């Protein structure tokens, strides 16, 4: 037995010191795997335990849902992806990309919505014997983002250019979908058509099964966590500036019929900014575009201690990064507003995150925060 082993096995001071040293080294090695090291997460955990619990449950639920679908899958073709990154999808696109990279799932190609008539937009065939399209390890993954359009998976599965015998080999999967219009009559008809396909994935079961039921602010609601939740605790800790000449940024997608008096009365007190990102380079991919939009948004919101926005993806970013803001959710689309309110309920926090239906109300909320 060598000297180190004799010391370790002994009951003397040297043996105990060696054991303590090895135990401490093991804790240091395992710490990144056991604990999130992000400072934002630590702050949330200590200052807002309920809020932190909801965020953690959101991310855990997303991974549970996706891992259950994509276990063993090595390659995917993304369908129904947006053709360009935009204000209503940039953070979701980043979340989808992060999850797939984290799970080492290779994206063979992506097909944007709406489906064009180009030959390269059709799904791959499996008769070439390629391991890439081995039905055991390959899936067609619906990557629809929260943009409001009808679910068109059947365009790919049931399109006349794809023989039904080939379609039967597809493993059809989907990122979470959170809006009621995906359960419309057209979707149900499409799902009925693909029901004979082995290993089918029915979107209509998402709300009842894969999404689970989570308790949000005392109410049990069904919801699908946005793919951007995979970024939770992974983004760099971003701090808002404490004080500027104009304390509040109003970051809008439209003018909300603001009266002229608004500009006259508040133009010195608030900064009004409409969505106007820089142009994308010609060679940029959609993932490059999403990152450019992310950088653009961050460059705006960090300049001010508070902001108001009607852009849902910016609101999500504010929630994840603990940024003080009010989300402007007008009641112009009752159904969508209802579902957004349902799952955002838990993320409203006193003096940090709030939701308002009118811009003037949102500004009054922040003015109250500033007095505290």
Curated annotation (Swiss-Prot):
Glycan-carrying positions: 38, 128
Record's function text: Involved in cell wall biogenesis. Has a role in the addition of Gal-beta1,3 moeities to galactomannans and their subsequent pyruvylation. Has a role in meiosis.
UniProt organism field: Schizosaccharomyces pombe (strain 972 / ATCC 24843)
Topology, Lumenal side: 36-372
A Gene Ontology BP annotation from the UniProt entry: cell wall organization
Transmembrane portions of the chain: 13-35
GO cellular component, one term: Golgi membrane
Subcellular locations according to the entry: Golgi apparatus membrane
Name of the molecule in the record: Pyruvylated Gal-beta-1,3-epitope synthesis protein 5
Membrane topology classification: Single-pass type II membrane protein
Cytoplasmic face residues: 1-12
Record keywords: Cell wall biogenesis/degradation, Glycoprotein, Golgi apparatus, Meiosis, Membrane, Signal-anchor, Transmembrane, Transmembrane helix
